[in-house]
Amino acid sequence: MDSLQLTFLLCLTQVFSFTKCQLQNITSCNSAINFTSGSIFPVNLNLTLASLVANASISGFATSSFGQDPNTAYGLTRCRAYVSKEECQTCVETAVREMQQLCPSQKEAFILLENCSLKYSNQNFFSTADSSSKIGYCNVVKASQPALFQSVLLSLILNLSSSVILSPSRLVNSSAYMDSKTIYAMVQCTPTLEVSGCSNCLQDIITYMLTGCNLNEGSRILSLSCDLRYEMYPLSLTYSPTPAPSPPPLSSQYPLPSGSNSTTNSTSPSSNGNDFLLQ
């Protein structure tokens, strides 16, 4: 059993409830790295951000860099695969505008919004995974058959996580049948990530999902470098995914821990840049 499967099974031994629903976006400005007015870096940064705005909605993902070291500005933006091109464009424009207002003199900053994320830096970070900040959206409807729901969801998510690292687009989707219902899911990584970076990012956000949304009939977990979504209805994806193989039949390969649904612990979501929202 690999570390991802083990992490899932350990997390499923605890089911958490939550009520905090405040955070809607995350912005981080690295105040330790600043530029001065009149220097060349802000010129390169403005060119980088303008390029991201111009190109992001075409494929839902864009990178850009301008300048020479040590004044090179690197930028990356990624839209959620299920948002329209118009929503993607609007989100990236909003992200740039808010970052320019909130981080007016920083050489490194990022913003995490519902429909997109954007980061810029004076260092090349394109292949580095970052899931340190996360937002979770959870459907208010709870699964009527918790044990069965957890089993089917776990099998589906494991299958997608194994498939996405082999996909050039770093985007896959699939579905799994559960009694009279079907769970539809997708996972997405930043295309520039290495296999290990994508895998580690997904492991982190799935573990996070299992602390708050694994009994809800729908969830979106968003981070800078990877996303996950599952619903009880087909997902309409604007940007083309790679279909994942159907998950294997439920068996003892991924057994639920004994008594996994017998105890409910109450905890508040963490306040270090992570939160859950009811949708």
Q: What positions do the PLM features span?
A:
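Extracellular secretory-pathway ectodomains and N-terminal mature segments of eukaryotic proteins
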Residues: 1-279
